[in-house]
Amino acid sequence: MSTNFKSQEVIANLNSKDLFTKFTDLNNLKDYLPSDVEEFESNTDNCSFKIESLPKMSLRIKEKHAFKKIKFESIKSQIPFNMFCYISENDKDSSKVSIEINMELNFMMKMLVKKPINIFLDRFTEIIKKV
């Protein structure tokens, strides 16, 4: 069963080009992750980390649509998922950002991961707002 988790849309204090550039180098992602994210490792195109009670997750950049959308996909993860970062220009110095995570989950798994994923999205977007 396809399950979507969506963040609120927030305003980042970077224009869409600068934010896109930061998010397409996964080494920069550590600066935007909540403090409760553990075991973060990265290179330019891949990263892995652990969130609360969830298993360790690994991501790679799958698609880039200049200054608008980045699609990440899971690799070597017990729970396969895609994560999308949507970026749109707000004004010349800021952009609107939202994050979406899509997973194939049965009902039981959805109940187990719903809270940690939503907490992660809330904290992640709060950090993006402070950029």
Predicted features by range, described:
Residues M1-E41:
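Hydrophobic ligand-binding cavity/cleft-lining segments
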Residues E41-N43, D91:
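Residue-level recognition of beta-strand termini and adjacent short loop/turns
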Residues V10, Y32, K69-I70, K115, ...:
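Amphipathic alpha-helical hairpins
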Residues T3-E9, N46, K56, N82, ...:
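Intrinsic-disorder/low-complexity, polar/charged segments enriched in Ser/Thr/Lys/Arg/Asp/Glu/Gln
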Residues L19-F23, L29, C47, I61, ...:
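Hydrophobic pocket/interface hotspot
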Residues M1-S2, L26-Y32, C47-L54, F72-Q78:
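Short, solvent-exposed secondary-structure boundary motifs
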Residues E52-S94, N102:
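Hydrophobic-ligand binding "helix-grip"
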Residues N102-V131:
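A conserved amphipathic terminal alpha-helix motif
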